[in-house]
Amino acid sequence: MRTGAALLVLYAGMTGAAGIALAAAGTHGAELAALATPAHFLIMHAAAALAAVAIALRASRPGLFLTAALLMLAGVTLFSGDVSMRALLQERLFPMAAPVGGTTMIIGWLIAAIGGLTELFAAPRD
C-alpha cells in the first residue's frame, strides 16, 4: 500500500473512532443529543473513505478515489467538528466551518462518482 493510501486509512480509522466516541457521549444526556448527527456523519464517511481507498488500489485512475477519500474526511472533520463544538461548548470552530465541510463532503462524493464513471470507460486491467 502506498504511503498516501495508508495515511488515508489511518485518518479514516481515527474518524470512525471519533464517531463512535461521539455516539457514546451523545447517550449521556438530552443536552448531548445534538452529537448524533456528527457521530453518524463521521462513521459513515470513515467507511466511505475506506471503500474509496480500497477501490483506488485497483482503479485505473486511483488519484480520483484517493482525492475523494481525502475530501470526504476533511469535510466531515470540519462539519462534525463545528457541530460538536456548538453542542459541547456553544462555540463555533470558525465561521462557516459546517457549510464548508458539508460542501467539501459533497465534492468528495461527486469526485467518487466521476471516478466510477471513468472506470466504466477504462481499459480492462489484467
Feature-to-residue mapping (PLM):
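Non-cytosolic membrane-interface motifs at loop->transmembrane helix junctions
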Residues: 33-40, 91-103
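Juxtamembrane helix-break-helix junctions at the cytosolic face
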Residues: 53-65, 87-91, 122
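Core segments of alpha-helical transmembrane spans in multipass integral membrane proteins
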Residues: 14-22, 34-58, 70-81
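Membrane-helix boundary connector in multi-pass membrane proteins
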Residues: 82-97, 115
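Short, charged juxtamembrane terminal tails flanking transmembrane helices
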Residues: 1, 118-126
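N-terminal signal-anchor transmembrane alpha helix
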Residues: 4-28
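Hydrophobic cores of alpha-helical transmembrane segments in multi-pass inner/ER membrane proteins
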Residues: 44-52, 104-115
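Hydrophobic alpha-helical transmembrane segments of polytopic
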Residues: 8, 12-16, 68-75, 101, ...
